[in-house]
Amino acid sequence: MTTELTYVVITPYSLSKSRTGNIIARLMSLSDCDLVGIRMMRPSDEFVDEYIRRVKSLNIPKVGKALVDYIDQNLRRENILKQQNRCLFLLFEGTDAVARIYDVVGKLTTVTESEANRGTIRGTYSDYVTTPDVAVRYFEPAVLLPTNLEYAKNNLEFFAKFGFIDSGIYEECSEGETTLVILKPDNFFKHSVRPGNMIDMFSKTGLRIVGARMIRMSAAQGEEFYGFLRDVFKKKLKPKIVAQLRQGMEGLFNFQITDDEFNAMAEVINEKNALYEFSQIVKYMTGVDPKDVPLADRDKPGKHLALALLYRGPNAVETIRERLGVTDPAIAAEGTIRSDFGQNIVQNAAHASDSIENAVRERKIIGLYDDAGADCRRIIENWLKVNGGSSMHLKEAARIQGEL
């Protein structure tokens, strides 16, 4: 049993049909693998040409031509659906990850052969319809992925070198405004449908995902991202401190304490209290207490993983926040994400920018503004260094397991 790295590419058609959330939910909850990388892609013609060459060299029986034709006709910027060729690249890590992910996805089979595929992603979302003389009438694989470790290594190396050469952010795919959503760390503490189901709920807005990145906020990023909350806490929490002082000191002294005196005492405590509450939020988002982080380590990635997504479309900021719900899950409207998935005002499922200006500020802090970073490439390259690149010819990889 070895720790493996594998990938899933969600096709442009699956993205356009808002199937992304459900696909991610199944992969994360059923595979027992960790989602360690994510990136939007718009393949170039050169990338598609090489991808086709690789698939052809596998000599996959039965489904090979249909797959080649699909890649050729659907992944190019000029395609038969006349839509943006956005794909979503997902990177998974885990014990026997290639086989586990493939089991969740399912095989490429015709409608008449699909009995064994029930319950899989392809059993739900893919189509492979043929005529009586076995000509392909309609083909949609839903996702693309490797079926054995050697082919995974080979193609991961290919993606790392040629698949992530642009920004990974495609705001030109839709008119309107762009807003930032962060699915918070508690959604990733265990393998769960939560992240995927939340993405599925956001999809009901009709907005498009135009960028994505797995993030580990550093202490410095966390403090910059949430820095404004220190003043908010000082203003909002002072009345609560006054009330607690009144309650705690009631009957302690044989003299009257005035309102001004309670306010003066609260002022002394207020700064410390605001700093504590602020540190708790940063600790939750990063996994490290900023007070305990040495200066030399403040820019190092934190311990907690979160998922940052860019949504774009008309009135994106307001639309996303309406779907998310108010800060406190206890009073959030039923049917909102925070009502369904939030626990308290800190662990409230997700963050969403409250203005276009703040979306820009926050995107710059987490590194999802000019580009989506090089995380996927770095993860792949580091894994290949430890586990070795592909030493097997593509035809031999095909012989081991067959279809994609």
Describe the predicted segments one by one.
Residues 1-404:
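Non-catalytic terminal and connector segments of soluble metabolic enzymes
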